[in-house]
Amino acid sequence: MATINQLVRKPRVKKVVKSNVPALEACPQKRGVCTRVYTTTPKKPNSALRKVCRIRLTNGFEVTSYIGGEGHNLQEHSVVLIRGGRVKDLPGVRYHTVRGALDCAGVKDRKQGRSKYGVKRPKS
């Protein structure tokens, strides 16, 4: 335990926590415009063509965001909403596009886990 005198000379320093999603600026989601929509390959040992897009956010940041689900309707100039959450096997991809919000349509014929892919409840 430090003495009062030691604390007067050199106070305790708060630890600085670095954000995993700096472009969101402490917001839950951010809006942006797609500048490029493309596929990329994951790190070893995985193999696929992952759908990603480059997005210019309203705060001026340019980030790469993953497009989850099977099939999408995004193209250049689409307005999308992004949330935090990295993709472990894609280096540099720290954000996810929100399906079913703004210009990004929900996943077609999705029956389970619908809320994560912007799909309304089907008529039974």
UniProtKB/Swiss-Prot annotation:
SUPFAM superfamilies: Nucleic acid-binding proteins. The modification 3-methylthioaspartic acid is found at D89. One of its GO terms (cellular component) is small ribosomal subunit. Keywords: Methylation, Ribonucleoprotein, Ribosomal protein, RNA-binding, rRNA-binding, tRNA-binding. Pfam families: Ribosom_S12_S23. GO terms for molecular function: rRNA binding; structural constituent of ribosome; tRNA binding. It comes from the Bacteria. InterPro entries: NA-bd_OB-fold, Ribosomal_uS12, Ribosomal_uS12_bac. GO terms for biological process: translation. Gene3D superfamilies: Nucleic acid-binding proteins (2.40.50.140). With S4 and S5 plays an important role in translational accuracy. Part of the 30S ribosomal subunit. Contacts proteins S8 and S17. May interact with IF1 in the 30S initiation complex. Belongs to the universal ribosomal protein uS12 family. This is Small ribosomal subunit protein uS12.
